[in-house]
Amino acid sequence: MAHPRNSRRYQDFDMDNTAQLADAVNAAIAVGKTIVPKGGGSKSHYRVELAESVTIDTSNHEGIVHYHPDELVVRVRAGTKISTLNAVLAESGQYLPAEPPDYDGLATIGGAIASGLSGSGRPYWGGLKDYVLGIKLILPSGEVANFGGDVMKNVAGYDLSRLQVGAMGSLGLILDIALKILPKPLLVKYFKVHCRREDVVSMLANFGQMPGLTGLKYFDSQILVRLSGSAEAVAQAEHLLPVERAPANITDFQKGAIDQLQPSQQLWRWDGQPAAPLEQPGLVAMDWGGALRWLDADSSQLKSVDSSQMTFVKTGSLPRPHLQTRQDGVGRLQNRIKAALDPEGHFIDYPALRLYS
């Protein structure tokens, strides 16, 4: 059953602050302050503080604008907690397959869109951008605009909605997002298998061919496997696992995720081929079947690693390293898009997160 926008189930967190946020953006533009969007603050470690800037907080701009379970579409305000959205969807047996990290309940859906982070199901279900249907935001001109829509099949043209995914708040202030959602799998089971470090790449490659696989990780000398589907399909896939497998649960599976890791030195993200050798120093966890790796290392230890594959996340006991923006083709494209959509530089630039020698 579709639930209307103002039904009682949503009233306790239904806050529309569009007018106030638009006023705040236009006031900052008028005095020449750089605008820094903020949601739950769970990803503030990506940025450094800027002089002559103003932070505009969207965390009170929250609630479900509308939710139509039969149509597999939900529109949600940017300040809504991911945990809240997940709970609402679960009541109808649905979920957001991109699984953006919720940082122990702090993360908002607007921050998830801005960061573009997706969970362990990324290789199997797609990333967050694949589930964005439409976005309402405040442009660098100060205008409120809508892009995309609330239907699966959208009009042709350049998709400014998905362009916001991973833009880190550099292209405008997100107000609300229309998302495609899916029914939850009939059955989900988790398993863990002990693995020596020297065997992890080959074991991940072997497990990666399994049917029903929706998550494949490595953490704390264990390979963590998630299988999803019908009871029959999951049972068949389970028999392909080694006999020494042990049952696990969702808490076990979530260990080693970006929102759970606390580095002693500096936390870095490595993206590459799953079969790449374990030559990166400070490896603490792997995801996406080995294509995503988390390193706890000093930047001085990473000189031998291809810098185009490394992204800074946050620091532990060490100071923040000297970082640069992307210098490759993607970086140049980011700069061109920023110049086209925010020529006056009213919103913050994409953060410098790359380490170049």
Where in the sequence are the language-model features?
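Basic, alpha-helical nucleic-acid-binding regions used in initiation and control of genome expression
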Residues: H45
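C-terminal substrate-binding/cap subdomain adjacent to the FAD-binding core in PCMH-type
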Residues: A114, L133-S264
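Short cationic amphipathic helices and targeting signals
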Residues: D12-F13, V74-V76, K189-H194, S221-L240, ...
